[in-house]
Amino acid sequence: MRRISVVPASIFSTTIRTLFVSAMALTASASLTSLFPLHADVLYLNEGEEHIGNIEKIGDGKIGFNEADGTKHTYVATETAHVLFSKIRPGDEISQVASITDPLVREILAKAPTAAQHPDSDYVTLFRRRTFTFRPDGSVLHERRKLLKILKEPGLDEANQSIFYAFDREKPDLVFAHTYGADGRVTHLTDDALSDEAIFSSTPEYDRLKKLKFALKKVDIGSVIDVLQRIETIPPTPLRPYVIDATFGQREPVLADEIVIEAPKNLALCIKTYQWTGNAPRMTDTVNASGNRVISWFFSDPKGYIPEQNMSSRSRIFPRLVITPETSWNDAAKAFKESLDKAAPSPERLDAFLTEAGIASGSQMMKAQRIYEAILKKIRLVDLSCFDYGGYDAPSADVVLKKRYASTFARTVLLYHALRRIGLPVDFGFAASWREGGIKREIPSLGQAEDALLRVSIDGETIYVTCDSDYLPFGHIAPAFQGTAAAFLEGDTFTFAITPEGDAVKNRVDQQVFVKLAANGSVDVRDVRCFRGPFETGIRGIKAAKTAEKRISAENTVKRVHPKARLIDFAYSNLDDLEAPVVLTLSYHIPDAALTASDKLMAMKNLWVNFESGSASLASRTYPMDCFVTSETTTTVVIELPDSYDWVPWNRTFSYACSFLDFGASLTQNGRTLLFADRFRVSRKTFQPADAYPQYRACVSAMADLDNQWIVLEKADVQATATPAQKKMTASETSHTDSPGNR
């Protein structure tokens, strides 16, 4: 689920985070600091009570303790569990909800809804304010305050939170984290519930991201949690940009949600809104007493939304706000070009790698494929995006060749310089997933980009290449980047293009099944499955598995055909050959695959037609539906019939066709052979509720009808003497509990 991100987007936790320091909270902080140093002692009693303050004296079996409110108390040592030295935070001196003086919190708690008012919600966001203060030098103070109430057990997960940050240019601070219990007690976060973790410490070249984890204490159903966070940044650059990308609305109710931007009047901001219809946030634009421009957007959605299967990304459905300091694509292009040139490998090291890749002979296409495959096989992939890397400064290709591991971005930099070395025209590009809307030209910042890709010209053919999978052939880009808007460096600027969709050649699955049906209803099967494009990556990943593990995988595959299926043999094609499709060949036996009502009548399901209709189970939709990729699948089943048996024809067709969907199936008998064939093609990935989805559902319904049909066989002498009613007998009325639908 997409949430507000400030590029590098993943430096923030997957929960939306911005914070707000109220005047009352600041006052409380100042008064607390005057009473105690920055750190304080937390005294834990055996009964579970927590007391915050300072230890004055320990002796004679007693502990003298100064409470946070200034009172003094003496505790018996035997009633004390332990003492923790912890940072003292604003509000830590308050132990009871009745003692809270912050008017904001008092008002929110007084009006907090009950679980009965939101019976379908796990929690409700009572208040959230995200404040971004831009300073004259371009640095930003990003603050977030959030109060939410836990209504059901799944909502307890909200007690565990994280702050992601790029430690080389950002400084996080957890100002406070309080739990307001349903019993009126207030519990505070202490330093033992905090941990600061590096994410990519094992790969120091990419180790910019850290995570500050914390867990609020004593969170239970009915509790309200109140968290205040802050991240302070250094000034951004074209290759370390700052982008605010916020989508309003979430599954759980949001009673009050506000984004506030404060910036000098002379700082130009690029502000873009999307899906700004219906329940759009209300905007105000003023100038404060300091002369700074203050823009705020307020949003409320007391209902939340009910998610639908395969629904489009929130950022393409709900109101979306994107803000970045005004700059230009030319500035980004100039900075990145300098970075890309600087990252070039030394000629000696690059030539050694090209020799290692085996490009001494062959066409330019063959050389490009060998270089690409050498990078996939010899440069271990570090799975992190440009967001995780924390910027768009090109990683050194020399370091990649020396260390032999790299991110997708770094792999792409190496491939770029290698292809140029053999004389191929190549453009370096960046892309964002089509599900998130791709790169938007009207937002002049690389901060939108998730990862890198190349556009190569070979023998007059334009080929797009990504390096984010070890198993995709050269020219087969990842599904996320198929049909998306990408930005390519050309000369002194970035130009924009839509990457090609997958087609019936690159995204496809073909299955050929040869079945010998015995008179007792058992079958012997030879099942050949051919995968191309994104469907082959999972199969190729099994190449490193042991033979026993491969056999278990094959056994599981045939069990999905029929629970009684028994694997006889299996084989894979050469999984190291990326240019050839992946082929899996299975041989198996299924006893009782067909039902025998008598010695002259037999019926069986077409076990190799398996449609799942979950994606079209809704009669109507509120939100658009996305499918994985544009693709084509075909199935051919050849059944050798037992002696004297003939198929009882269906006398009906199963097909559906429109401009972006095509399904057809046929079943015919030729001699002793029954031949089934079907084909399903989809050339659109997003289906709007009012027009495209009804057509998608109609197509899936036709496929579901086919899935419900039984193949009925009769001996020839019975067929010859049967009554007209018997000849028309089919099992199409037979109920079947499987969920049919899209393959």
Across the structure, where does each feature detected by a protein language model lie?
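Cysteine-centered nucleophilic/redox motifs
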Residues: 146, 223-225, 259, 371, ...
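Secretory-pathway-linked proteins and extracytosolic
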Residues: 78-79, 84-115, 220, 232-243, ...
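Long hydrophobic segments that form regular secondary structure
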Residues: 491-593
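Compositionally biased alpha-helical segments
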Residues: 35-128
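Hydrophobic/aromatic-rich core segments of domains that either
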Residues: 409-499
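A surface-exposed beta-strand-loop module
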Residues: 175-246, 283-318, 512-514, 565-600, ...
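Early extracytoplasmic/domain-onset interaction patches
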Residues: 90-163, 501-529, 566
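Short, conserved helix/loop micro-motifs enriched in His/Cys and acidic residues
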Residues: 351, 380-404, 434
